[in-house]
From Swiss-Prot:
<keyword id="KW-0067">ATP-binding</keyword>
<feature type="binding site">
    <location>
        <position position="65"/>
    </location>
    <ligand>
        <name>L-glutamate</name>
    </ligand>
</feature>
<comment type="similarity">
    <text>Belongs to the class-I aminoacyl-tRNA synthetase family. GluQ subfamily.</text>
</comment>
<dbReference type="InterPro" id="IPR001412">
    <property type="entry name" value="aa-tRNA-synth_I_CS"/>
</dbReference>
<dbReference type="InterPro" id="IPR020058">
    <property type="entry name" value="Glu/Gln-tRNA-synth_Ib_cat-dom"/>
</dbReference>
<feature type="binding site">
    <location>
        <position position="206"/>
    </location>
    <ligand>
        <name>L-glutamate</name>
    </ligand>
</feature>
<dbReference type="GO" id="GO:0006424">
    <property type="term" value="P:glutamyl-tRNA aminoacylation"/>
</dbReference>
<feature type="binding site">
    <location>
        <begin position="29"/>
        <end position="33"/>
    </location>
    <ligand>
        <name>L-glutamate</name>
    </ligand>
</feature>
<dbReference type="GO" id="GO:0008270">
    <property type="term" value="F:zinc ion binding"/>
</dbReference>
<dbReference type="GO" id="GO:0005524">
    <property type="term" value="F:ATP binding"/>
</dbReference>
<dbReference type="InterPro" id="IPR000924">
    <property type="entry name" value="Glu/Gln-tRNA-synth"/>
</dbReference>
<dbReference type="InterPro" id="IPR022380">
    <property type="entry name" value="Glu-Q_tRNA(Asp)_Synthase"/>
</dbReference>
<comment type="function">
    <text>Catalyzes the tRNA-independent activation of glutamate in presence of ATP and the subsequent transfer of glutamate onto a tRNA(Asp). Glutamate is transferred on the 2-amino-5-(4,5-dihydroxy-2-cyclopenten-1-yl) moiety of the queuosine in the wobble position of the QUC anticodon.</text>
</comment>
<feature type="binding site">
    <location>
        <position position="247"/>
    </location>
    <ligand>
        <name>ATP</name>
    </ligand>
</feature>
<dbReference type="Pfam" id="PF00749">
    <property type="entry name" value="tRNA-synt_1c"/>
</dbReference>
<keyword id="KW-0030">Aminoacyl-tRNA synthetase</keyword>
<dbReference type="InterPro" id="IPR014729">
    <property type="entry name" value="Rossmann-like_a/b/a_fold"/>
</dbReference>
Length: 306
């Protein structure tokens, strides 16, 4: 990897470590937030991500996205680990906690600012809500504050957010990406991209609800690295009303299924069937499902969307 002038030596070394890990073979990850019990949609993504890594004889990491402390729930980290163990989805190495990596996120943020790739933005959520997006499209920030050279510190009782000046190729797909929120929290996109690059993640398999995040993350990767990360997306599970499963809606997790007497093979079979990997009614462990898919080349990849 060619050394980037944007990065001081210690960050360049972190990127080199990530590249060496990536060169050793496939590295995937599952990255839940500890905001409540995992629902079946989360578990389906975990299963498909685990299968993709194991079919490639690769590593599968567990990362806990716990930066947004006010939303975290006591006991959620232990609960999600127990659920993965129960399903037979074992991860490699120690669990990675984003809350313990704030130093490296802030270092990358400072490096990008020193290179002039960031600017202060004082657009409020209300102002952005007034910007209408085309039907069926996510909002692309129009660059309102890009050339204003606004003050970086407190002004009228609030801090600005910090945005990345994206290159022209991303201006219409992601817009300028927030890397530090106005409340001082590191933004999701920055933490995620830094982790993918420094932990050596070669491919991310995640829910289709994060498809809109891909362009913002690719724009940030483009700003700090020459090595792209591959993103693939799992179709969402929906309830009877066609709504995607969500923690805030209280959709079913493993506790309710276990209370009905269902075992891991029932749940793994149902999750696999929901993605057309096996027929409905099949009962098999995660290991047995992996063995079956090894006999059916390309079946899992047909499920995943770019």
């Amino acid at each position: 990897m060619a050394k980037s002038s944007a990065l001081p030596d210690h960050l360049y070394e972190q990127m080199e470590v990530g590249q060496r890990l990536r060169n050793q073979g496939y590295r995937g990850r599952f990255a839940p937030s500890p905001t409540g019990p995992l629902h079946l949609g989360n578990l389906c993504t975990a299963l498909v991500s685990w299968l993709q890594a194991r079919l490639a004889n690769g590593a599968w990491l567990l990362r806990v996205d716990d930066l947004d402390q006010p939303r975290n729930r006591v006991g959620a980290v232990e609960s999600l680990q127990q659920d993965l163990h129960w399903l037979g989805l074992e991860w490699d190495g120690p669990v990675v906690f984003q809350s313990r990596r704030r130093g490296i996120y802030n270092s990358f943020l400072s490096a990008l600012r020193r290179q002039g790739k960031l600017y202060a933005c004082r657009c409020s959520r209300r102002m952005l809500a007034d910007i209408s997006a085309p039907a069926g499209r996510h909002l692309v920030y129009p660059g309102t504050c890009r050339d204003l050279e606004l003050f970086w510190g407190w002004h009228e009782g609030r801090l600005p957010s910090w945005r990345l000046r994206v290159s022209k190729e991303f201006s219409h797909t992601s817009g300028d990406v927030i890397l530090r929120r106005a409340d001082g929290f590191i933004a999701y996109h920055l933490a995620t991209v830094v982790d993918e690059l420094t932990l050596g993640i070669s491919e991310v398999v995640r829910g289709e609800d994060l498809l809109d995040a891909m362009n913002a993350q690719l724009a940030l990767i483009n700003a700090i690295s020459e090595r792209p990360v591959i993103y693939r997306h799992v179709p969402l599970l929906c309830d009877d009303q066609g709504r995607k499963l969500a923690k805030r809606e209280g959709h079913a997790g493993l506790d309710s299924l276990r209370s009905e007497g269902l075992g891991p093979s029932h749940v793994v079979g149902w999750l696999a069937a929901s993605q057309s990997l096996v027929p409905f009614g099949a009962e098999l462990t995660a290991g047995e499902l992996l063995s079956e898919l090894k006999k059916k080349e390309g079946v899992l990849k047909s499920v995943l969307k770019p």
